[in-house]
Amino acid sequence: ETGCSYVICGHSERRQILCESDEFVGKKVKIVLAYGMTPILCVGETLEERESGQMKTRLLEEMRAALSGLSPEELLRTVIAYEPVWAIVYSQNNRSVFIRGSRRTDTNFVWRFRNRREYFFFP
């Protein structure tokens, strides 16, 4: 036992460098939950996906692949972190206007009840 209670799944650098697919990330989320830990699922679009209007599609694809088959209880135990790949990989300024636009894209995103305040009031 490591004493770990949170595990990051789907970080963009692991997806890119280690070729982790959405399905593979989904398997990791399920394993983390099975061991009683809390997965932090990272989702985010590339600059090309953002500029071509594919942001919503990409985010939903990542979330569907990672969260499919989870029970309502498991969904509540999962944290979703929006991590725009373009802000990390391309050293673009991660302006709050982009973040606000992204999180308003689909109100069906899953977030932890305890994190609702941060979700709605992000600067």
Regions of interest found by a model, annotated:
Residues 1-110, 114-116, 122-123:
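Active-site loop-to-helix "anion-binding N-cap" substructures in soluble metabolic enzymes
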